[in-house]
Amino acid sequence: LAAPTKSEQWIKGVEVVVHLAAKVGIVGSYQEFFDSNVLATRKLLEKAKKNGVQRFIYASSPSVAHTGNALIGVGVHKAEPAHVRGSYSRTKALAEIDVLAAHSPDFSTMALRPHLVWGPGDTQLIERIVARARSGRLFLIDGGYSLIDTTYVTNAAQAFACAIDAPTSAFNRALMVTNGEPRTVRETLGRIAYAAGAKAPSRSIPFHIAMAAGHAAESAWRIRKSEPPLTSFLVEQLATAHWFDLGETKRFLEWSPSISLDQGFADLAMWYAKA
């Protein structure tokens, strides 16, 4: 993202660009997120069109349309940069808007929104959940009964592969990518912990207390310039239902998840057993 000369070298002679890179998390100034997620995407779009790229597939996020309300069996809502939470979501929303606006008869664009991608070797979601479970710091919010969608990594990769060869009618739109198997937060966290040989979370705290703690942690860790152990966004994600309708994705990409959550959890357990 920070090396425009290299990115142009990579683009020359290719027909399809799949743009996955982004600045994630909450640490950093808004400008840092904007530069990495918005400006870099705009430059990549410009270079792609200049070098004759035919298709541009952007890895977006469901958070670009999540304004705090529960999302229950919904399709794709439009990106809402003015109303979403945090610099990451806001800048990803702006970038998605730019990508779809760049669509033309000679330059097909698409945004895929994979939700909570996980699998063996994951250093983001899985590693953090397991570390907290092993240290006894993994907890539930309001019992952990909200339903959420997640995406096994193989299914996410296959969705992007299908997008590369998708019919032209599939482009000029955003599409959701998940396993299509909503489970409670309690079950999801518990099975991840169990796969790693750790105890499932049993402690639960009320939403309002967790949210206050999240805001306090954000303020304290902002001074340290490091990732806080809890954020208001994470609290919201753990306490709010968010699962989606995959009808359009399956139809336009001719794709469906090939690895079930149960198989994914089994594969995760096997990976930890060998680690």
Question: Which ranges hold each PLM region?
Answer:
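Active-site Tyr-X1-5-Lys
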Residues: 83-113
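Conserved Rossmann-fold NAD(P)-dependent oxidoreductase catalytic core, especially the SDR/UDP-sugar
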Residues: 43-87
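Glycine/proline-rich active-site loop of Rossmann-fold NAD(P)-dependent oxidoreductases
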Residues: 93, 106, 118-128, 154, ...
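Amphipathic terminal alpha-helices
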Residues: 244-252, 256-275
